[in-house]
């Protein structure tokens, strides 16, 4: 009889934020700061609402702040790529990391949007 491989549960949200990094990420050289920055976009306490518009609501302001954060990350990545392509003094690893951070943040934002749209459609189908 073959021995059963030990079960390793998936990492928790705090572990993904950098609380407990795995050996694989250490050996792969993944920048934990970029992951933390991308996951901080999902943390409602990390964003502050500058607007007090009650018609849009706190959730709407939170989402707008997240969109603005992702947009700024993408703009930063674009400017770094442009600087690298035009011969600027930019480290290639920093450019790649910046592009990957922006990509991860955008993908997470799209997943949030998809979940919100699914919830909205489900609410629409509720019989009154």
UniProtKB/Swiss-Prot annotation:
Keywords: Bacterial flagellum. Residues 33-55 have a biased composition (Polar residues). GO terms for cellular component: bacterial-type flagellum basal body. It holds the Pfam family FliE. InterPro entries: FliE. One of its GO terms (biological process) is bacterial-type flagellum-dependent cell motility. Residues 1-60 are annotated as: Disordered. GO terms for molecular function: cytoskeletal motor activity; structural molecule activity. The keyword Transmembrane helix does not apply. This is Flagellar hook-basal body complex protein FliE.
